[in-house]
């Protein structure tokens, strides 16, 4: 058993996260979240974006890391980061058809400090299916 979850790290300051928004832009979804350094020292924090299929029809991991962004913040500073989720971010490889498939349906988008610490999450609905040969 691992001692620390994937993405775990320590800092000499504190960060607050707020306002997770996920918006649809064409075939992509854009995840945005604001991070504020609430401590007395400058520091860096990493926002990790995980995707979870709410109703999987094929075997896949419960939660998959699909993007991340490292932010350096001075004390009291707030920055908003944007992470683009393409159709491939929602896809799973189908060994029978030999292609990547992102099905339509409900997915949970989570913003996390590490794999075990989901700070905020929201559901999105993909309205179309996407396929791609490797």
What does each model-found stretch correspond to?
Residues 1-44, 48-52, 70, 75, ...:
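Secreted, periplasmic, or luminal enzymes acting at the cell surface/secretory milieu
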Residues 57-95:
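Intrinsically disordered, low-complexity Pro/Gly/Ser/Thr-rich segments with frequent PxxP/GP/PP motifs
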Residues 42-49, 61, 93-96:
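Short, hydrophobic/aromatic beta-strand segments
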Residues 28-32, 78-82, 119:
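Intrinsic-disorder/low-complexity, polar/charged segments enriched in Ser/Thr/Lys/Arg/Asp/Glu/Gln
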Residues 38-40, 54-56, 88-90, 116:
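Short coil/turn motifs at secondary-structure junctions
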């Amino acid at each position: 058993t691992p001692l620390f979850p994937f993405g775990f790290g320590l800092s000499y300051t504190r960060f607050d996260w707020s306002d997770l928004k996920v918006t649809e832009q064409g075939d992509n979804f854009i995840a945005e979240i604001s991070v504020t350094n609430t401590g007395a020292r400058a520091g860096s924090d990493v926002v990790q974006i995980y995707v979870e299929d709410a109703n999987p029809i094929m075997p896949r991991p419960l939660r998959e890391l699909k993007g991340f962004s490292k932010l350096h913040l001075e004390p009291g500073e707030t920055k908003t980061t944007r992470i683009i989720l393409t159709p491939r971010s929602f896809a799973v490889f189908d060994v029978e058809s030999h292609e990547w498939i992102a099905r339509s349906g409900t997915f949970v988008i989570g913003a996390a400090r590490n794999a075990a610490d989901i700070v905020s999450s929201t559901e999105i609905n993909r309205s179309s299916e996407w396929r791609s040969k490797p």
